[in-house]
Each structure stands twice: as structure tokens, then as C-alpha cells.
Amino acid sequence: SAPGVIATAIQRNDVLVRGGGANENKYYLDGIEIPVLNHFAVQGGSGGNASLVNTDLLRSVNFYTGAFPAAFGNGLSSVMDMRMRDGNPTRFKGKLILGASDFGINFDTPVSRNGKTTLLASYRRSYLQMLFSVLGLPFLPTYNDYQFKLASKLGASDEFYLIGLGSFDYNRLNTGLKDPDDDQKYILGYLPENRQSSYVFGAGYVHRFRAGQLRVVVSRNAFTNKLYKHERNDKSLPRTIDYNTEQSDNRVRAEIELRSVGGFRFTGGVGGGSGHYDNTTRRPAYTGGQLRTERFDSRLSFGRYELFATLSREFFGKRFSVLLGLRADGTTYSSEMHNPLRQLSPRLNLSYNFRPQWTFSASVARYYQEPPYTSMGYRDSTGVLINKANGLRYIASDHFIAGIAFTPDAHSRISVEGFYKRYSDYPVSLIDSLPVSTGDFADYTIGDVPVRSVGKGRAYGVELSYRNTNLANTVVNVSYTFLHSQFNRPGADLRPTDEYVSSDWDVRHILNVSAIHKFGRNWTLGAKWYLTGGSPFTPYDFGLSSQTGAWDARQRPYYDYALYNSRRLQAFHQLDVRADKVWYFAKWRLGFYVDIQNLYNFKAAGQDILMPETDASGQYVPDPQRPGHYKMKTVAHDIGGTVLPTLGITVEF
């Protein structure tokens, strides 16, 4: 429900903020970066189907769509700072969740007798494959995740904690469908099976003193992604796709916060670490009119370093505040990226309470983000890191933001904010001259192509929001965003032109309305309705798509990039509702919930599917009029249109 966040129409958990892609957001848990937030993540593009983070374990969440803290780097569109609560210091507490599509257990407990060391943990497992099988969907996902925090108070001024977050995911094809329709056949034709796992383990030490605090965090994360597909989905036949990759990071950061330095507040720190990427790929490709097998192996390691500082002060009885920040990042990946002065990231935030209940705020900043591992580690057929040779650089984004907020009382807030984002040095594919962050939701990796850092873009718009935490015992959130998201279409020589075209996230309109009401007898009803303007799309290249070698390589149609995003789908909207009932007993409580997504079964007409006709045995039919081509047909395709009901019980003790 946050302003400027696009809700996708295909049951995904992608966070698309103010016209930026899902890979432009960064997430932190207790000060430790979380590179993979979602199950079934798209490598190089972030996003995914469901969040790994169990919100029951969180104490607070700060979501920044601008004016990012200097301590948190490597993001272009948003930063989410999540903080976990500590475990219960006096007694064991637990919670069981048994739903129609998942199971979970949470517990928090003292570990030491004096309660100074506590443990908070959760484990969840989905069995969506059962629900999806009943619904006749062509893929059957299963995911598991775990999360924990071990916290210890070493004294009045010192604290130590360990955190962990991880997942194990498996998505297999539903090849047992009886009489699959064309839509199901199409998905079964191109979608590979997928195994993913990820983990983040980190440790933090906090020392508090009279004038501030010192925090040191160390962490390691890893993400493993395996994709494979067999001819005709028959596992006795050879694999046509065999993709195995692992990426990992080791990180350390130290920061000091001083609450009063001559009336100023100062935060500063340093950090460093290393990154590692391994990739073994075997996949079909269609180039130069020939079907071939693309093979490459890549191993990459490099170092990172960062430096940041923030200085802030309040004036005029705390009515006016100023914050100055500076950050610099660098890596040993290449000469283009090793000098942190090239990635100097200044920022200025202003806030002025010019009248009671009225506040004006503004910020201007430059942010930098590393290109995805898939681009950094891509090698050509001779083993050369081709993108390193092409001068791959950090992606840059300049933000200009201003807004006014009115706070009539302690429960409500009304605000309007305008934003302008300017992108530069975006990696552009040498294959289709498009930014590597683009790609439809059928893509399972993004960025593993030859690129050059020549892309430019812009996103701008205005947001209006209203929030009331006690409107007739109801929490109400309403937000509307009007935006444009575009990139500069390079010319044939990849030089910038004056032509701007819509990005994949140029939806123009975003409307979110949500409410949670508490009734008597411990009933709670929540509802969320959201509307997203029509997404742009690119027409198919019929001639290329129908070529037998081209279709056999991809099992999907090819786009006519000369007409990139020149068409637009209709708007999408959806209503989700949830009802909860709780019964309280002496030492435990029982809860029951019903959750329904897409209550009124709205279906949006998507881009038609272009696919070959098949004969009675399921083989593609050649076009007798065009040798070397398949006979093609179009199939209507709806986005959404699935009511997802679930119910469950919770037991807390």
C-alpha cells in the first residue's frame, strides 16, 4: 500500500518503486544486507513470488523511496530497513500456523537463566503445489524458509546478536495435466524446472556510550540457482537447458553514531568485503539464422570497499532540519569501478515545519549501484569477461524530490510529493539495444548477455497519500501515484538519441486503498483494493518467431524491438480480503482466518500468445507455404483471473 509501489498482476512479490525495476531496491535486516528477498527470485532482476521474511518477527520497518541513509548503499529506487525484535526474556512463547497452502512455526524464548540471551526463530513450508494442482496450473512450486535472531545483552552498554535468513525452493512442471489447453501447453513448453537456495548469516556488536554508539556487523550470504529442462519434458531425454550458478558475498561494516558534536549529529563508517560468482551454462540459442548450443563457464571474485558519513542538525526550535550525506563505493572488478571517487554519492535533505501541522521537505541525491553478477560474470565463447572489456560501470541515478505533509492530528496524515529520477550508465544489451533490467516475467535470468554502460533513463511523477490509524476504529491507507518511466533508446551505434520510449514499468497510474477494522468479539476484517494502469508491451516479430530453429531454441515468440513497448494493455485491478477471529484461553489462544485474493475474479486481457499449431500427436505443424517455418496461431491470454482462497488456524501459547 506504499505510494509509488506497483502491484503486479501475476501473483508476484516484485517491489517496483517509482518507475524503477525490481533489481533497484535494497533490503537490510538488522543492518545486514539481504540480497535475495523472495522465493523463486529472477537472478539479476530480483523479484520473486513470495517474501522470505516472516513479518511476525519484525519490530519495525522503515521504507525509503528517496533520501536513503548513507550507511545503506547499492540501491537506486528504494531501501527497506527491517529490524527484528528480541526473543522473550522471561518465558517460552510459540505460534503454530496451519493454512491451506502453508505451515509455519514461530517461537521466542530465553536461552540463559537470567534472560539476557534470547532466541527468536521461525520455519515455514508451503504446499502450494497441492493448491496449484487442484487449480490446474502448469507449475507446482514448493518453498521453505527459516529465520532467527540470537541476541545477548553483554552488559548495560553492550549487545551482541546473530541473525539468519534462508530458503529452499523447488518448482517442478505439472506434466500430468489431462488435456492441457493452449495456455498450459505454452508454459509447459518453455518453462524450466528450478531449484534455488539462499542464506544470509550475520553477526552484530553494538556498544553504547554517553554520546552515541558503535556498531560492527559482519555477514555472509549465498544464492544457488539451478535451472534445467529436458526435451519434451521427458527426463529420459537430454537436457536442453542446464544452468547452474552460485553467487556469494562476505561483508563487514563498522559505523559510529555521535548524537552531539557541536550541536550536530554525526554518523560515519567504513566497510568492505568480497564477491564471488560461478556459472556453468548450457542452453540453446538462435543466432545468425542457426540453432546452436551456447556453452560457457565463468568464475569471478573481486573485493569491495565503502566509506560513508552523515551530518545533520536542527534549527529554530527543531522546526528546520538539514542533513548532509556522502558515500563512496568501489570494487576491484575493473579499472572502471575501482576508484571510489568515481562513485561519489552526495545527498542533501531539508525539512521545514513552516506552520503547525504543516511540513515541507526536499532532497537531492546521487546514488550508485553495482551491475548484476550475471552481467559482471558473463564471458564470451573464448572465456573473456566481455562486459569488463566493454567498460562496465556502476549504474547512477540522480533523485530530486519535494513534498508537503499535513498532520491534522495524532492519527492522520495527508501528503503530496513530486519526484524526478535521472538514470545514467545503465547496462544496455548489445543483442537488442535494451537495458538489461527489462524482460518479461517469463525470464528466469536477466543480464547474462554482452552489454555496454551507455543506457540513460528517467522516471518522474507525483504521489498523494492519506493515512489514518483510527478512523472509526479502522486503519485506512489511500495512495495515488501518477508517473512516467522511460529510457533513452540508443541509436544503431549505441549513442544516445533524443527518443524516449516507455520502460516496462511505465504504468502511469497506481491506486491503492486498504483498510483494517476491528469488530467486537475479537473479529478483524481487512481489505486491499489496488489498480495499476496498463503496462506497455512489444508486438511479436512473426517472421522470426515462426522460424523452426528460432522457436526450437526459445520455445517462445520473439519481439519486434523496432516497436518496443509501442502497445499498452488495459488497466488491472484486484480486491483481496481477509477475516480473522481469535479465541482467548487461560494460557493460549486460538485463531482462525480466511484469506481470498482476487475476490471478484477480475481478468485482464494480456498480450496474446503466439505459438505453433500442433497435430494430434502434439508435434509442431510445418507451414507448407513457407519451408523452414512453423504454422502459427494466436491464443487469447488473460492476466490474473484466478481466485486464490486459503484458510487456516493459528495457535499461540
Regions found by a protein language model. Give the residues of each.
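Periplasmic N-terminal accessory/gating domains of Gram-negative outer-membrane beta-barrel systems
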Residues: 1-68, 79-81, 85
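Face-selective signature of the C-terminal outer-membrane beta-barrel domain
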Residues: 151-169, 191-337, 353-355, 412-415, ...
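Predominantly transmembrane beta-strands of Gram-negative outer membrane beta-barrel pores used
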Residues: 60-71, 77-85, 92-138, 145-153, ...
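Gram-negative outer-membrane beta-barrel transporters
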Residues: 315, 420-422, 441, 446-539
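Outer membrane beta-barrel strand-and-loop segments of large Gram-negative receptors
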Residues: 245, 249-255, 295-308, 389, ...
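Surface-exposed extracellular loop regions of Gram-negative outer-membrane beta-barrel proteins
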Residues: 176-181, 224, 278-285, 356-400, ...
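C-terminal beta-signal and adjacent terminal beta-strands/loops
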Residues: 424, 476, 522, 530-555, ...
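Transmembrane beta-strands of outer-membrane beta-barrel pores
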Residues: 67, 84, 100-102, 111, ...
